From Swiss-Prot:
Kelch repeats lie at residues 301-348, 349-395, 397-440, 441-490. PANTHER family: KELCH PROTEIN, RING FINGER DOMAIN AND KELCH REPEAT-CONTAINING PROTEIN DDB_G0271372. Gene3D superfamilies: 1.25.40.420, Kelch-type beta propeller (2.120.10.80), Potassium Channel Kv1.1, Chain A (3.30.710.10). This is Protein C13. Keywords: Kelch repeat, Repeat. It comes from the Viruses. It comes from Swinepox virus (strain Kasza). InterPro entries: BACK (IPR011705), BTB/POZ_dom (IPR000210), Kelch-typ_b-propeller (IPR015915), Kelch_1 (IPR006652), SKP1/BTB/POZ_sf (IPR011333). Belongs to the poxviruses Kelch family. Residues 27-89 form the BTB domain.
């Protein structure tokens, strides 16, 4: 199969021909300021390919600044001018990132089609990372399924580049195709040696993904010797309740066997852990909910909303627990399955905004108030957004970022008018940042900001809702990413995730 494919947008070409027939001599030009150069494009063409550009050019001047490289954006301009794009393994990542962040649907779908056709042993990890970083479930789910199926065939050096987070998703699955559980152990040991920072993280993999009961006697011996090198043999808790993986379960079906006891190897097994305090109860309930969920505390009740299941599908499930009685409560499911939503309290209702559904980022918004039998459909966003920062003020709901890592845009929902509008963009992006409403101002704190193409995690901005202006405030003393935030007395407290 060719590693280069050309995609033609026939519907767009028809619109393009109509525009050319009606060409005027005073056509308006938009200047796109990229990293490394300036790209010129006709405004009429630019706004026809994406609602994002339509909104940006409507509310700003004819200069647009993007954080993408000049060469990468030339492929986008070629499509805008001709309706044709040629995709290969070298340019697919940049084209896909731009099309996702700027909502160019044809290019996005073309990249998805190209990547799904070209997942191989050498490209699977790259395609997985492209899909995940752009929030595209279809891409990274296909890549993960491929990696699990070909795990022992893919070159180890390629798999060693995966992070702890990536490996948790891949190795925990019962569909991981290995000849024995020893294969998993040997890979974890190799991964621990690949980088010094992997050593501590590898103990997490051992406790969370390794199916100890199905190691061979040699595998258990190997594990014990490896742990002993770091003085961990008595401090690692292993889960003995997992079933065998599908690829080797036939060897354990209808068979009585004697397992070597953990005490033989001086390893403590994770049994039925008794709940020792109230916080443990909440933690236990929370850990059983789906990852990538939204969370909010309302009237002393903790709500965990949406997320993904073990098959990595977005879900509509909600877990709610009374933090006073520590009793789990019933809450109706969402109308739309979603992971990575924005969640906030506004007008005594829980608002769930955007997120990622089965087909990618969502515009949908829904709300619910305790006592209601189902969620209520609300006016959708102007742009699909996932993992945005969201905060309510007296009469407005603010949704910040969520289109891409470098997104600086905000949308404002007016409760009185029941409409969304585009607000004044931030000075910097704050991907993975946190948000607060304090003394009449909105604060965007930390997260990933791009300054002269350098990654910065300490920026703080303050927004005045009355003047619709952002100002840059004093930076954080430590870089923060995906931190938590709370108001304590008269101060904003940032908790966790110092980023280095």
């Amino acid at each position: 199969m060719s590693k280069q494919e050309t995609y033609i947008d026939y519907n767009y070409i028809e619109r393009l021909n109509a525009v050319n027939l009606n060409r005027s001599y005073d056509e308006e030009i938009v200047f796109i300021m990229t990293v490394g150069g300036v790209v010129k494009v006709k405004k009429e063409l630019l706004v026809s390919v994406s609602n994002y550009f339509k909104l940006i050019t409507k509310n700003q001047s004819n200069e647009i600044t993007v954080s993408f490289q000049y060469e990468s954006f030339l492929d986008i301009i070629k499509y805008i001018e001709t309706g044709i794009v040629t995709i290969d393994l070298d340019n697919v990542e940049n084209i896909f990132s731009i099309s996702c962040s700027k909502a160019i649907d044809f290019l996005k779908n073309s990249c998805i089609d190209f990547m799904s056709k070209h997942i191989t042993d050498s490209t699977c990890v790259k395609i997985y990372k492209i899909g995940f970083s752009n929030g595209c479930f279809a891409v990274y789910n296909d890549a993960i399924a491929y990696i699990r199926k070909r795990f022992t065939k893919i070159e180890t050096d390629i798999l060693l580049s995966l992070s702890l987070f990536d490996l948790r998703i891949i190795l925990k699955s019962g569909e991981l195709d290995v000849s024995s559980e020893d294969d998993v152990l040997l890979f974890i040991i190799k991964w621990s040696r690949h980088k010094k920072s992997n050593r501590r993280k590898s103990f997490t993999l051992v406790t969370e993904v390794l199916r100890y009961n199905y190691l061979s006697i040699y595998g258990k011996y190997k594990l014990t010797k490896w742990l002993a090198r770091f003085g961990k043999n008595n401090n690692v808790e292993l889960n003995e309740n997992e079933l065998p993986r599908i690829s080797y379960q036939h060897r354990f079906t209808n068979r009585r066997y004697t397992m070597v006891t953990p005490s033989s190897f001086s390893i403590n097994m994770l049994g039925n852990v008794s709940v020792k305090n109230e916080l443990s109860i909440i933690n236990s309930i929370a850990e059983n909910h789906n990852p990538y969920c939204g969370s909010v505390l309302m009237n002393d009740i903790l709500y965990l909303i949406g997320g993904i299941n073990k098959s990595l599908d977005p879900v509509s499930d909600i877990t709610s627990v009374d933090t006073r009685s520590f009793i789990e409560l019933h809450t109706p499911p969402l109308l739309h399955p979603r992971k990575c939503p924005g969640v906030a309290i506004f007008k005594n209702r829980i608002y769930v905004v955007g997120g990622i559904g089965y087909d990618g980022p969502l515009k949908t918004v829904e709300s619910w108030s305790p006592g209601e039998q189902q969620w209520r459909e609300e006016v959708p966003l102007l742009q699909p957004r996932f993992n945005p920062c969201i905060i309510g003020t007296d009469n407005d709901l603010y949704v910040v970022g969520g289109i891409s890592e470098d997104d600086k845009t905000i949308e404002i929902y007016s409760y009185e008018e029941n409409t969304w509008s585009i607000g004044n963009a931030m000075n910097y992006s704050h991907f993975g940042g946190c948000i607060a409403y304090h003394h009449g101002y909105i604060y965007m704190i930390g997260g990933l900001s791009f300054i002269d193409n350098i990654h910065v995690f300490t920026m703080v901005e303050k927004y005045n809702p009355h003047s619709n202006k952002w100002t840059v405030e004093k930076s954080l003393p430590f870089p923060r990413f995906n931190s938590s935030l709370c108001i304590i007395e008269d101060s904003i407290a940032i908790i966790g995730w110092i980023y280095y």
